[in-house]
Regions:
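Conserved mid-domain beta->alpha element of the FAD-binding
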Residues: 20, 269-294
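N-terminal FAD cofactor-binding segment of flavoenzymes
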Residues: 45-86
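N-terminal Rossmann-like FAD-binding beta1-loop-alpha1 element of flavoenzymes
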Residues: 5-32
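Central beta-strand plus flanking loop segment that forms part of the substrate or channel wall
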Residues: 65-66, 167-202, 212, 220-221, ...
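Conserved FAD/dinucleotide-binding core of flavoprotein oxidoreductases
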Residues: 207-270
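Conserved N-terminal helical subregion
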Residues: 73-173, 181-186
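Conserved Rossmann-like nucleotide-cofactor binding loop
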Residues: 15, 38, 167
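Glycine-rich FAD pyrophosphate-binding loop
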Residues: 24-48
Length: 294
């Protein structure tokens, strides 16, 4: 059966769902196509993929109706920042009070953001969710585009939006070229328990190998770390024993929060800049990582 919509959003992650939620007061017919259904069960241990949401991001999420769902699940406000250079006196620190703000932002798991947005989108009568489903073909015409999904669904859309990540299927289908370069670093992420409480302060140290950030989570002695370092060293850090990793991490962070203890998995991913030459082409638009990564 053919379905006609005004906008088909490929990708139901944070960006795609935020875009769909932004049309909540419009008469436009929206379809969101996502290849997987997010697990709604939150483990006691936070996911290793988190985002630092600014106050501006909070304002947007409040307008979309998703902020309450984020706070009800899990969000960690941070009230101060400390940044320093290893083996140097260079240091900067500031807090929300000095800026007349209630906080500087929140550290939130990406999946929590996705679930809170999904909760809102599911309430919208003008949005249809196709989860799980993937686009298999796309044909772009002068007045509309035609899509087919792997579940047999066919649809037409006046605009197709790619919110399908750094390796965007839509961007590749449209042969949109990329400007890209490799930073020569990998980001290692993990959850870490610290001997001393973080006091809701985000901290980052710049070392000869690259920056290391400790982002405060909801539990007073739990941080999400982002460790940017050379690929070979990142691989070493991934495979070394927990005991060796804890010792290395504590030393690299100048023992600022006492002895560190990794909890759960460690993961790493390459840091690469990707920038689509065109964000908008005939009846197609790219948003989020599909348009540009860090």
């Amino acid at each position: 059966m053919m379905q006609s919509v005004d906008i088909a959003i490929i990708g139901g992650g944070m960006v795609g769902l935020a875009l769909a939620a932004a049309f909540k007061d419009s008469d436009l017919r929206i379809a969101v196509i996502e290849g997987s259904v997010p697990d709604e069960t939150l483990n006691e241990l936070p996911d290793v993929r988190v985002s630092a949401l600014s106050r501006s991001s909070e304002t947007i999420l409040r307008k979309l109706g998703a902020w309450q769902g984020i706070e009800q699940r899990r969000a960690a406000p941070y009230y101060g920042m400390e940044v320093w250079e290893q083996d140097s006196f260079a240091k900067i620190e500031f807090d929300a009070q000095s800026m007349a703000q209630p906080d500087l932002g929140h550290i939130v798991e990406n999946r929590v953001i996705q679930l809170a947005l999904l909760e809102q989108v599911q309430k919208l009568e003008n949005v249809t969710l196709f989860m799980p489903a993937r686009c298999t073909t796309l044909a772009v015409g002068e007045q509309e585009s035609w899509l087919t999904l792997d579940n047999g669904q066919a649809m037409t859309a006046k605009l197709v939006v790619g919110a399908d990540g750094a390796n965007s299927w839509l961007r590749n289908q449209m042969d949109i070229p990329l400007t890209h370069w490799d930073y020569g670093h990998h980001a290692l992420v993990a959850n870490v328990k610290t001997a001393d409480p973080h006091h809701s302060i985000a901290r980052q140290i710049f070392t000869p190998h690259g920056p290391l950030a400790f982002l405060p989570m909801s539990q007073p002695n739990m941080c999400s770390i982002v460790w940017s370092t050379e690929p070979n060293r990142a691989e070493e850090l991934l495979v070394m024993s927990d005991e060796a990793f804890n010792k290395t991490l504590t030393s690299e962070f100048d023992a600022r929060l006492g002895v560190c203890e990794v909890v759960g998995e460690r993961a790493a991913f390459p840091l690469k800049m990707r920038y689509a030459r065109d964000f908008v082409v005939e009846r197609v638009a790219l948003v989020g990582d599909a348009a540009h990564t860090i």
